[in-house]
């Protein structure tokens, strides 16, 4: 059922996302489906369309061993892996668990930690692209490190990452402990605190970090390096 106040809040959130992404909200529609969905539930879908000049399309052809992988921190689970999240915390059977305050979360409720808005990286990344040779970008969504980082790698190159260098928030450690999830499955499902990675030449890594730090990503850091091989090596 269409509740104007609820619709207004949804559109407000979408509009804020558009501001962060520096794009326009150009349309939309609302349809009511009585009898098909519970009265207090709704389904939201959207998409963006981007255009890039051919000469500006990123190429990984010059990617080589020694290039540096930079991490842009996430704000949380970033809308991915929620089927596993619900299973781990038994949310469907006990929704009140969302109001619990595990010691690991520093005073936040579980619900607050899980529903932290997904960070939008458009503006800081565009600033880096203006001044640095970027050889690859990977958005760490569903599939975690193992499925997303390889998408930007040149054939014959691997991403070598020291697990000790990954700044993983307490929420992920809590999920792993409660759910008894293997380390591999955690890195193959969740972003583990890294929402996006950018690969740049080693000699431009400091400059790229300076740009990120000055444009809304003060906690961006060096995550790993490119080496010979395939896929992702977590060591």
Question: Can you name each region flagged by the protein language model?
Answer:
Residues 63-112:
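Acidic, glycine-rich loop-and-beta core segments that form the ion-binding/anion-interacting portion
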Residues 1-83, 225:
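Glycine-rich anion-binding loops of enzyme active sites
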């Amino acid at each position: 059922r269409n509740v104007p106040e609820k619709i207004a809040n949804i559109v407000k959130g979408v509009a804020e996302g558009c501001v962060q992404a520096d794009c326009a909200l150009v349309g939309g529609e609302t349809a009511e489906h009585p009898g098909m969905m519970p009265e207090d539930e709704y389904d939201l879908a959207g998409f963006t369309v981007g255009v890039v000049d051919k000469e500006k399309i990123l190429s990984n052809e010059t990617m080589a061993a020694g290039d540096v992988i930079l991490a842009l921190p996430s704000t949380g689970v970033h809308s991915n892996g929620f089927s596993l999240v619900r299973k781990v915390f038994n949310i469907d059977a006990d929704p009140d668990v969302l109001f619990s305050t595990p010691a690991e979360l520093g005073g936040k409720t579980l619900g607050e930690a899980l529903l932290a808005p997904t960070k939008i990286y458009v503006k800081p990344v565009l600033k880096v692209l203006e001044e640095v040779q970027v050889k690859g970008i990977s958005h760490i969504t569903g599939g975690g490190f193992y499925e997303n980082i390889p998408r930007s790698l040149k054939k014959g190159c691997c991403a070598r990452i020291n697990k000790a260098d990954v700044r993983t928030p307490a929420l992920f450690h809590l999920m792993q402990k409660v759910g008894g999830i293997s380390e591999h499955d955690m890195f193959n499902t969740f972003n583990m605190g890294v929402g996006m990675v950018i690969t740049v030449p080693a000699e431009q890594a400091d400059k790229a970090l300076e740009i990120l730090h000055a444009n809304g990503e003060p906690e961006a850091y060096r995550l790993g390096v490119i080496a010979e091989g395939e896929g992702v090596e977590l060591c």
